[in-house]
Amino acid sequence: IRDSETSFYIIDKVSNESKLFEKTKKEIKYYKILFTVILIAILGSTFLYNRLKYFKAQNLHDGLTNVYNRKSFDIMYEKYREKDDNFALVMIDIDNFKLINDNYGHKFGDTVIKGITNTICVMLEQDDKVFRYGGEEFSVLIRNKFGEEVADIIDNIRVAIANKKWNDDVTVTISAGVAHISDSKDVLEEADKNLYKAKQLGRNKVVYK
């Protein structure tokens, strides 16, 4: 009888251990699946976040030049007007750009736009904001400098661009209008007026006041 009881005890113990082992295997499998799902969710969220970040950046930058676009300008300009009492706005236009496109082709026109963008960015400080405002027109927001100082900086850029050598010895020039917040609350309108004056004066000029 005792041997029989011992046998039943052993069988019962083995059976319980077998059930426990099967339960543990199921739990391990469950946690593996759960871990995989969580990992996929994390990776998916990271990928989605990076894609959204990329598309947001693309939405605020110009595709050709990689500087800020018109949408970015509208946002930053309003922020500057609301919060900053010492900033200048520059409106820049490539002179006779339609003739450049007509005579040398749009590919060369794109080269000119990229080259001028690069010159502007290199000659400005890191905190200055450069925008492709549209077509052959650019805008620049500069903080903590007064109008005369900004006009001098932009004139140096104008000279550098006029002296730049392009294909077939083509000469490209820019005109620019500068305005400061201390001169007018509507800085954009003032800068546009000064750009128009620069054009009227024969182009290849920077006008402030």
Labelled PLM ranges:
Residues S15, K23-G63, K71-R81:
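Signal-transducing coiled-coil linker helices
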Residues F55-I75, I92-H106, K114:
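Conserved nucleotide-binding and Mg2+-coordinating catalytic segments in signaling enzymes
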Residues K56-A57, R70-N86, T117-E125, R143:
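Short regulatory alpha-helical coupling segments
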Residues M76-Y104, I120, V187:
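Active-site-proximal structural segments of metal-dependent nucleotidyl cyclase/transferase enzymes
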Residues F108-K129, E137, I161:
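Active-site-proximal alpha-helical element of nucleotidyl cyclase-like catalytic domains
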Residues T117-N118, E149-W166, D192:
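Alpha-helical scaffold within the catalytic cores of cyclic-nucleotide enzymes
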Residues K129-R132, D169-V170:
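A short pre-motif secondary-structure segment
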Residues A151, A179-K209:
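Catalytic-core segments of nucleotide cyclases and related cyclic-nucleotide turnover enzymes
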